[in-house]
Swiss-Prot record:
InterPro entries: CbiD, CbiD_sf. Its EC number is 2.1.1.195. Keywords: Cobalamin biosynthesis, Methyltransferase, S-adenosyl-L-methionine, Transferase. It catalyses: Co-precorrin-5B + S-adenosyl-L-methionine = Co-precorrin-6A + S-adenosyl-L-homocysteine. GO terms for biological process: anaerobic cobalamin biosynthetic process; methylation. The gene is cbiD. PANTHER family: COBALT-PRECORRIN-5B C(1)-METHYLTRANSFERASE (PTHR35863:SF1). The keyword Cytoplasm does not apply. It holds the Pfam family CbiD. Belongs to the CbiD family. This is Cobalt-precorrin-5B C(1)-methyltransferase.
Length: 365
């Protein structure tokens, strides 16, 4: 009998960014106008020099130019734009250069603090550069002296944008056209981390020097209740507390409130920068030691070590009058302070599932 072996998981598949899609569709439409060539695929060069071929859904003339579309393939990354139709409309202009327009489903910047000026379409700098380089190369090949007007569209983008951080960042009406390498790495969460950085930038640029970084909706509600902070000062960090703390080295604010569920704050207290269960776990033995430091007797310490969850450990400590929540927040505070610049005042809140505060450490002068 043949011995069975465990099936090896297939490697995760990378995808292409919305910036790559916009580049490919803009190039295809421009080629149709300058060369008359109607293709079902187009090849582009990514920022690091890799060449990729992208399939087109259509490439056709319009009343005053041409348009081409492709389906966004994010590979195995859980990207909100995966499967969306992205299409670019190109019009030739007598003046050299490229003018970008936010079409259907692409947002417009309405707040200062982002890399793009207020009023600009939310097509980020590297996608703009990619599109510009490809169209300039085409213009030189065809000895075309004029310029291009490029309108980028994402079908259903306005609805998809509501699932992103764009409304909070002041990018209204649709999605952002993103990408730095042109490639989407599965589960890299690069776009989410970038939105955290942008949220901090926008808050500071608009004069909000006290921000609250929260792991979810319940912690945001807690911070609204405690401080009445506006939405622009609330940073939805999810599990990526490291993205907040490290960015504050470059863009410091005066005051930082960190708020999250007790379990996630316990991970922060243990020195974890990524609070997702894939990357960090709750150390019940460590919780027992912190409980001991807060006055827990040996029996309670042992019970905490054997607890099923951090919430159960917290409940047992609370019943015994041991302030485990505060102890955990103090350790989380110490770790956060070790990362951010010394001028940033920090405090930490831990909450239960109902949003009640079960621990706090730190404060502001």
């Amino acid at each position: 009998m043949r011995e069975e072996t465990a099936e090896q998981p297939a490697p995760l598949r990378s995808g292409l960014t919305t910036g790559s899609c916009a580049t490919a569709t803009s190039l295809a439409a421009a080629r149709l106008l300058l060369e008359g060539s109607n293709a079902d695929a187009v090849q582009i060069i990514l920022p690091k020099g890799k060449q990729v071929q992208m399939r087109l859904e259509f490439c056709r003339h319009t009343a005053d130019g041409a348009e081409a579309g492709t389906i966004k393939d994010a590979g195995d990354d859980p990207d909100v734009t995966h499967g969306a139709l992205l299409y670019s409309r190109v019009r030739l202009t007598p003046e050299p250069g490229i003018r970008f327009i936010a079409g259907q489903g692409v947002g417009t910047v309405t707040r200062p603090g982002l890399v793009l000026a207020v009023g600009e379409p939310a097509i980020n700098p590297i996608p703009r550069r990619m599109i510009g380089e490809h169209l300039q190369r085409l213009a030189e090949e065809r000895a075309y002296p004029g310029g291009f007007e490029v309108t980028v569209n994402v079908e259903g983008g306005a609805e998809l944008a509501l699932k992103t951080m764009n409304p909070r960042l002041g990018i209204l009406g649709g999605l952002s056209i993103l990408g730095t390498s042109g490639i989407v790495r599965p589960f890299s969460c690069a776009a989410y981390i970038a939105s955290i950085h942008q949220g901090i930038d926008v808050a500071k640029t608009n004069g909000y020097l006290h921000i609250a970084a929260c792991t979810g909706n319940a912690s945001e509600d807690t911070m609204r209740r405690v401080y009445e902070l506006p939405e622009i000062a609330l940073i939805e960090m999810g599990d990526f507390v490291g993205a907040v703390l490290k960015h504050l080295r470059k863009v410091p604010v005066d005051k930082l409130s960190l708020c999250g569920g007790f379990g996630k704050i316990s991970k922060l207290a243990a020195g974890h920068m990524d609070l997702h269960s894939r990357h960090s776990s709750i150390d019940l033995s460590q919780l027992a030691q912190w409980a001991a430091d807060a006055g827990a007797d040996p029996a309670l310490q042992q019970a905490i070590r054997q607890a099923n969850t951090s919430q159960q450990a917290l409940a047992m400590a609370s019943a015994a009058g041991v302030a485990l929540g505060d102890a955990v927040c103090r350790h989380a505070l110490d770790f956060a302070r070790s990362v951010v610049p010394p001028q940033v005042q920090v405090e930490v809140f831990a909450i239960d599932r109902q949003g009640g505060i079960v621990g706090h450490a730190g404060g502001f002068q």
